Every structure is written in structure tokens, then in C-alpha cells.
Amino acid sequence: MRKKSKLRSMWISLGIIIGLIVVIALVAYIAISALIKQGVVTMMDIMSTVNLAGKYFIPLGILLLLIIIGIIVFHNRSDRFNFWFKWESLLAFIGVLVLTVNIVMVGPMAALLSVQQAQLGTVSSKTLKKSAATDEDIAGEGAVLLKNQDNVLPFDGQKNVNIFGWASTNPLYGGTGSGGVGAIKQTNLYQGMENAGFKPNMQLYNFYRHYRKDRPQVQMNTQDWTLPEPKASTYSTKMMNHAKNYSDNAVVVISRSGGEGADLPKDMTNLPKGAVYYGNKGDFKKGQSYLQIDKTERQMLTKVNKNFKNVVVVINSANPMQLGFLNDYSHVKGAIWMPGPGQQGFNALGNIIRGKTDPSGRLVDTYLYNDKNSPSNNNFGDFQYSNGKRIYNSGNKGLAFANYTEGIYVGYKYFETRYGSNNGQYRRIVQYPFGYGLSYTRFRQTMSQLHQGRNGKISYSVTVRNTGRRAGKDVVQTYYTAPYTNGGIEKASTNLLRFAKTRNLKPGQSQTIHFTVNRSDMASFDQKTGKYVLDSGNYQIQLKNNAHDVVTTRQFNLANRIAYNKLPGDKKATKNEFKEAQGHGITYLSRANNFANAKKALAAPSKNTKAPASVAKNTTVPKNEKMPKATGKMPTTKAHNNLKLAQLRGKSYDNPMWNKLLDQMSVKDMQKLVTYGGYQTPAIKSISKNQTYDFDGPSGLSSFIVKNLKTTTFPAADLTAATWNAQMANDKGQQVGKEGQAAGISGWYGPAMNIHRNPFGGRTFEYYSEDPQLAGTMAANEIKGAKKYGVYSYMKHFAMNNQETNRMSGINEWANEQSIRETYLKPFRMAVEDGHAMATMNAFNFIGDRWCGANNNLMNNVLRGEWGYKGLVETDYFAGGFMNSNSALANGTDLMLSTNGAMGAKPQGLNNPTVVRQMRTASHHILYTVVNSNAYSKDAVKTANAVTLPWKKRLYTIDVVLVIILVLLECLVVYLDRRKYRD
């Protein structure tokens, strides 16, 4: 009987242990699955963390195994022995567990915990209120009136309104991923209409909410492209009769989502692996894209058109949809484009429809009747080399590539140059030109003559008069045309030169806007000489309503060709840096002989395209990556110069004090500083550097890691750009800066300024425009605004991160140098030279055969050399594989976006003086940026010595308490033993 009792006790003990293990595993699985579904982490993140921290739990596992063996082996021993064995095993296990958790928390998980446990400040209600007003102002100035037949808008005399479309109850406020929406509750579309004075038909609201409440997820790890629209047959006769009696006015909302991690589907019947669509059967035919309206939406529009006199369609999509359907319905008389307006921007939509705000936005992209006419259509997407091998640690089975064969002819520059002179053909292809937008009032613009001043300056002015009956703002757009020689340097026929927005003009009021430009602003990059040049001949500067419709033309003549050694604002001479990026055997589009090579240049690449040898080598890093040769002396380290980082605030980059400060750092200090750059820069005790925080994203400060961050979600970048108001961008930057200053956030992962190369780009909402001049102007102003309050803005993604497909698997992007410089680098150059950017995030992709983060020509020769950039450069999320920290440091990258140092983020070769010098240079860039931020403002300097973070103090306090508890438990065990087993 006693033997059975001991056996039963053994099994109970083992059952408890196994049960605890199962419960822990189940909880971990549920938590990890939730994080993956929310897009917070990927399986790669989980595996890297397990690989990094798992080894620390091996002793704990061994101890647990020994305890289990002991329970089995000793289960027949005396009761007193088993009493001691079980209790001492439990206490030992708890002690080792506490020790292990401590080692992991202050070791590999310390950087992540430093962010997750950040002690952030509270943004005042006054600042949040001002941010909300700025958000609403941007949305109001950025929304574009596309159609207003019979002056159907505004609905200023009526309150009742019907709102159709499932998206009306689930509109998009922004995109997903790093540019996603923050924690503060948004004003929804219905509330925006109510706040403007409307009374929406709530029967329709309840109908759509009953159909489906949540929006399908389009995130990094999940792409559900379902368009939840009720079938026309589900609209009951009773509900429609009520709606007709309620109002003759109807608003229809159609939205399209997008986000980080995936481009939009070109063919809804052939989705990429892992993507899903659960919409109504037959919604799309073969070859129809996500940017077309589906069958159910069309039937809904037919029903609305049949039952209501005045129908206005709201396009809630950042990506340019095919909007030809707006011409298919007799009662669809109005249309407004409003992509993600941020948390309060739908108030602006209500005010526009009500007539309280005059729409003054202009399109930032060209809208086509058929997106297949985009010049990049056949060279945007998933293309794999036929001879590619699996990229190391990327999870991709092949080597991906994309050919930018359209060259400089992106967006309107292609359509205006190729079709602009043939108005009939142009109108059949282009529905709405770049820069297009209507108003409720009328304006007349008159342009002065050109005045040529000294040093190549040209000045002119434009006077705008409100000739209508309503107050409103107008946009002034000026473009240039440079002389083109057949077969010479490629030049678009139309190029945005300068733009501005008027103040609010009452009827009869006018405003004169003055412009001064450099002749060099009209220069083209000559790949033969590696210089920007102005060819001799006649130059036109045109005042236009948009990229197509001319108001006035002025011209000047240049007698002799000018070649610029360097552009105004540059610090070093320009030379060819990207010859290899052009690739071999790729045909690029040319204007020669009226685009004679268009068919060949714009064709899709062959399925049997083979990777060049250089690609096979440079995309399998670190297998082919070698440590730099050890040269020179080891830099001074651990010096006792008694300097603190705070003392360097305001000092020039070249001040001798920097060398003395850097001498104080140990090699391990430098390694730590450059490694753990994930949403932060770490504390370094030797120089009294405090912990700082860098947060996402382009729509305002947000975080995947820190929950309940109370900051503002501003309108999407393309809506900001659609204001065509540089001051609006500056205002947005200032509010981000104010919120960052209040919260204790020093770095902002934004703005993003890649180009809308193709309508299907997943992050179109996050980028400004298809035009680099517009993008660069907006970016520079946002950066200047944030900098005013000590927040350094990470201009991103440097460079050419223009598609999401294959971006993390080392996609090789091939482009000629002219297009790289004139189109894809120009916004960044403007951000540096005009916006004085001090932080940069580079990109996952390769330019040619070199990863951006290890591209010396890009990082050192152009960014730091030509442009004179002194700030820090960080990788995009450090994902291993082709990303290698030693290679990055050697080629101009300073900081790894890593929270755990895994997957090669931690530089190796600490005894190599070359590596140490590279880390020292990187540390200089990081520290120079940080010390001139709000982290070292007058108030912040007081706490600059606080290098022991609050979460560590709490951890140490908990450790002391646990040790005391363990000691007390041990005393209790001794007491119980003596009481129970006294001889």
C-alpha cells in the first residue's frame, strides 16, 4: 500500500511538471501567434530570438531533466528524503530560473526591453489638440475634387444624406506597417459628416455594420484582399424606399487598402502565395486588378444611380484606381479623392461636401483608364533569375530582380512626353493628369516675364485672382521644358519646376507669388561625362493648371552648353557612381525617334533571364563576405579624458573635442552602440550617453512595441503632398517634433520619400508622389519642422525601395544612372541640402549588385561626399542574410536596426584595427546626431548621466525581493522538516 502511495506521488509530481510545461508552451504559442497575426513580429524574429536566448536556458533544461530523473529514481526513498528532494529541487529550479531570466534580460533581450519598458512622457492635451487641427487642415487642403458635374457639390442646403458602400463604416485612415495608425481613437466618416452638420441615414450604417464589422487585414504577415461589399440583392425594397424618401443625395465610398510587406494584386484571380480573397464569387474576371471596381461594387453603383439624383463617389485609396466607371453613370455627378486622412481628417471630408471648406488639393500621380499602360507595368512584380541559388537566410528560393527600363520616364513624364502632343490619344489613356484638381470657385492666373539675374538665377511671378463667388485657395504649378536633341540626353517634355499655394482668397482678392530658380534646376544628368548639363537652345517655363494643360509659356535662350562640376548645394564634384547598376543586356526606354524602342524596352523580362556572376557573389553574403584587411594602428580606447557627451552639443562635427570623447569609449562600447539601433540608441556609461528612442513612422510617431503611445496619426504622405503646400508639410513636421519632445522621443522613422513608380506599390500611402520635386519639397519641409523641436528625421528608404515584392530577399534593381539621380535620389538630395536631414534609413534592396546598406558609391561617395551629409545612417530592419554589419560599417552605414544583435547585426573582428576605426567613425556619426537632438536639450542634459534604465532598477529590486523570498522559503522548509520529521 505504501509503495503504491509513493508511486502515485511520483506520477502526480511528474504530471504537475509536464502540465506546467504544456501550459507555458501553449501560452507562448498563443502570444507568438497573436504577435505574428498583428504584424508585430515575423517567424524570423521568433527564431532569431530563440537562437540567441535559447542557449541560456540549456542549464535550466538540464536541471529540470535531472529533477525528473531524481523523482523517478528516488521515489521509493524515505518520506523525509523525498520531502527535502522535492522542496530543494523546486527552490533550486526557481533560483536558476531567476538567474537565467536575469542573464537573458540584461543580455540579449536588454535592448528590446529598453524600448518596450521606455518611460515616455505624456503629450499635453494642448499639443494633441493642435496636432488634430493640423491633421484636419492637411486633409482639407489635400482632398481632390475630381468631378463636379452641374455643380452638384457642395450639398450646402440639405442635411439629410445617404451613405453607401461597406467602406463607409470601415474607411481607411492610413496604411499598415511602419506607417500605420496610432492608438488615439479616430473620427470615423459618419462622425465627420455629422460634425459638418449632416444627418446620415443610420439604417444604411447599421446594414453595413451588420454585414461585417472588421476590415480584412493587409499587413506584413497577412494579406487578405477581400472587398466586403454586400450584394445588390441584399438591399431590401423597404430600406431603399426609406433611403429615397430620406434624401435625393447619396455618397458612395470605395476604398482600397495597402501596406508594408506586399504590393497590390495585378490579377485578383491569381494571387501570390499566402494571399487570400473571400469576396463574392465572380467579383473579378481573369486579369482584373485590385485597383478596378469589382462586380459587386458596380452593381451597387447601378442601384444607387437608379434611385438617386445626385451621387458623389469618395475614393478612399492611396493607390491610383482605374476611375473610368465615374463616367458610366448619369447620376454620378461628383467625385472626391481622399486617401487615409489620419485620425480626424474625415471632419474635413464632411466640411468639403457641406461647402464649409473649398477643395484645393491636386493629384500627386497620373490616373490612367488602364493601369497596364503604366511604363513600368511589365517590369514591376516578382521576377526571378533562372540560375539563382537560395539566398542565405532570406527564406527566398531564388534571386529576385527588377529592371527599371522606363528610365526617367516615370508617371506624367512618360505620358506627357510620348502622348502630350496628341491630345486625342492622350485623353484616351490619361483620365486625370498629375496636378489635376477642381474647386468650388474660379481663379485666373497670370504670369510675368522671366527675369534673368546673376549667377544663373531666373525669377518670375504669378498673380492669382479669385474670380468666383466662394473663398478658396489655388495652386500655382510651373513646369519647364529643356531643348531635346534626337538621340541625345534623355529629357522629358514636362518637368515640375516650382509650385506654391495661395492663402485663402475671398472673391475678388488676388495674391502674387514670386519664384526664383537656378538654371541648374533644369539640368539633365549626362551619363557620358558624369555631369549635370544644360544644352544650348530654347528653354520654356510654363504656368500650367496641371502637367498637361498650359496657361502661359515663357522662354529663354541659352547660347552655349553648360556643364556643372557640382550642383549648387553640393559639396563635392559629381561623377558617375552607378555605371554597374545599369546592368548588361537591358534595353532602356529612349525618346529617340518618337520612342521607337518602346516595345522592346517596356517588354517583360524573359523567364530564362540569368543572373550575372557579380549578383551570385554579392547576394549570398555572408558566405562571400571577407573581413577587412587589418591595417594601421588600433585607435585609442578607454582614455580618461573626463568628457561627457552633453559637452559636445552645438560643437562642429570636426571639433577636436570629438576625438577626445571617442577615445574614452571601449571597443565593446562602440560595438554596443552600432549594434543595438532598433528603435533606440543605447546608453554608454563611459561618455555619459543616455538612452534615446527612435520610433516609427511616416504618419506620425507610433510603435509596434510600446503600447498606448498617445500621439497623433497624421494624413498619409500622398494626401500631405496633395496639399501642394510646403507649409502644411512643415506644420506636420513641427507637430511630430512637439509630440516627440514631450514624449521623450528623439528620432522619427520618417518621412519616407520613395517614388510612386507603379500604381500597385504597397506603400504608395507612405510615399509622396510619382514626382521627385514634389516629394523632395514636402520631405525637406517635414524634416525642418520636426528638427525645430529636436527630433531628427530618418529620411527613408535610401534608396529605390519602390516595391514591396521581394524587398527583403535581396532584390537586384537595375537602372541607368540618369534615372537613379534625377528620379530616385533627388528627393533625398533635397532632404539633405534643403531640409538639413541628420538621419537616414537605407533600404533592403540592391542597386545593381550591391545591397544599399553596403553600397560605398551610394553611402559615402554620393550621400556623404557630394551632398556633405554628416548625420547617422541606419539599416532597415536587420534581417540577416545579405545584410552584414561588418560590410555595412565598411561602406558608410553606422547603425543596425536590431534589438537583439542577432543574424549578423553585431560586428566581428574586434581585434582588427580597421574594424575598430569603422566603428569609431560610425559612433561619431551617431553621437553627433543624438547630442544635437532633444535628448540633450537644456532640460534633458540634467538627466544625461542616467545610464541605468528604470526597468533595470525595477528588475534589480524584484531580484532582491525574490532572493529574500527564497531564503525565507528555505527557512520554512527547515522549519517544516524539524516539525514534521522530529526524531
How would you name each of these model-derived features?
Residues 1-524, 533-547, 566-983:
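Glycoside hydrolase catalytic-domain context in secreted enzymes
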Residues 530:
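Extracellular/periplasmic metallocenter environments
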Residues 549-567:
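Short beta-strand elements
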